[in-house]
């Protein structure tokens, strides 16, 4: 019995020391709560966390002090992480759209060297996700909370070629576009 308890503690400790995540503070607001004696002020923080290898999450936290609000938001973000398959480890597999409330976000995969073309909160999500080339546009609500939720909604809808092939009962090679690999003309002339 004691051995099993030690093993559990060891697992929990190992989980806490798991890969370190990068985090980005997106927004911080002063909030107030009206009580009988007046107003109590506090702070709300919005944080995006990711491993820059395809995992990302966001969280919000409220507290009387800024560092505590950021800590709470970071903890929530780590608990709510999602995994997104990236094409060539740098961009999205296909164009997608996400919605939340009055906010709509359109995300498009981009050729190598394009960079991250995204505004404010969306840029933080893509950087923490590890995307290097993407073009995105937010339409409607510019509220950072809505923009991040809409971006996450779109990312959850992404389908990797493997999952599409599995649904269709085909091979991954049949799904991906074919690229002709013809030898360069200079090599054939010399030979």
Curated annotation (Swiss-Prot):
Pfam families: Ribosomal_S5, Ribosomal_S5_C. Residues 181-191 have a biased composition (Low complexity). GO terms for biological process: translation. Residues 155-191 are annotated as: Disordered. Residues 21-84 form the S5 DRBM domain. One of its GO terms (cellular component) is small ribosomal subunit. One of its GO terms (molecular function) is structural constituent of ribosome. Keywords: Ribonucleoprotein, Ribosomal protein, RNA-binding, rRNA-binding. PROSITE patterns: RIBOSOMAL_S5, S5_DSRBD. Disulfide bonds: none annotated. Belongs to the universal ribosomal protein uS5 family. The N-terminal domain interacts with the head of the 30S subunit; the C-terminal domain interacts with the body and contacts protein S4. The interaction surface between S4 and S5 is involved in control of translational fidelity. With S4 and S12 plays an important role in translational accuracy. HAMAP family: Ribosomal_uS5_B. Part of the 30S ribosomal subunit. Contacts proteins S4 and S8. This is Small ribosomal subunit protein uS5. It comes from Roseobacter denitrificans (strain ATCC 33942 / OCh 114).
